[in-house]
């Protein structure tokens, strides 16, 4: 099996760090890892796979090195700008933001449900919202067996879904301080 070159975009954020943890556990056939983030995080060091990596600033030339797969977790605006650049250079982009979820040309994939919908030619793969993923996993076998007609599903979204700034705001407001990220006190909703 060919060894892959894998990039993590947003490597210093909460989701990016989780990507790194999962990659470390999975032990995929990888030749090189490339860790990208914002200018603010560029130059920071990340311990990963027993090595120290220096995080690079993401830019238009970041994907000029034969990257096969890029995991994006840096927010919708970053994905909208850089995913097409990566895809145009042959990279398969797996995007964790909402940027590509409603774009017909992009596959919306939950691997346990519809991996067969993946088409390498499309290059940009979106994943659904986390609450959608957790709902379709048990619903798929029920639908296959019984043919569901309608599902009513209610979720409560975690503040962590808005990233580190959301978590910081929750902690801040729990201490009685004013919010800086949310327009209201998230701990009182």
PLM region spans:
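N-terminal Rossmann-like NAD(P) cofactor-binding subdomain of oxidoreductases
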Residues: 1-186
């Amino acid at each position: 099996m060919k060894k892959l070159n894998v990039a993590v975009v947003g490597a210093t954020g909460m989701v990016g760090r989780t990507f790194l943890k999962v990659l470390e556990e999975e032990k995929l056939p990888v030749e090189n890892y490339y860790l990208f983030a914002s200018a603010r995080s560029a130059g920071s060091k990340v311990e990963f796979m027993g090595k120290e990596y220096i995080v690079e600033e993401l830019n238009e030339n970041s994907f000029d090195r034969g990257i096969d797969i890029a995991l994006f977790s840096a927010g919708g605006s970053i994905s909208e700008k850089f995913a097409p650049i990566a895809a145009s250079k042959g990279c398969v982009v797996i995007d964790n933001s909402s940027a590509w979820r409603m774009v017909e040309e992009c596959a919306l994939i939950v691997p346990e449900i519809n991996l067969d919908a993946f088409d390498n030619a499309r290059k940009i793969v979106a994943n659904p919202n986390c609450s959608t993923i957790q709902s379709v996993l048990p619903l798929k076998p029920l639908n296959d067996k019984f043919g569901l007609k309608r599902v009513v599903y209610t979720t409560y979204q975690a503040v962590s879904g808005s990233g580190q700034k959301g978590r910081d705001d929750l902690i801040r407001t729990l201490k009685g301080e004013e919010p800086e990220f949310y327009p209201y006190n998230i701990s009182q909703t």
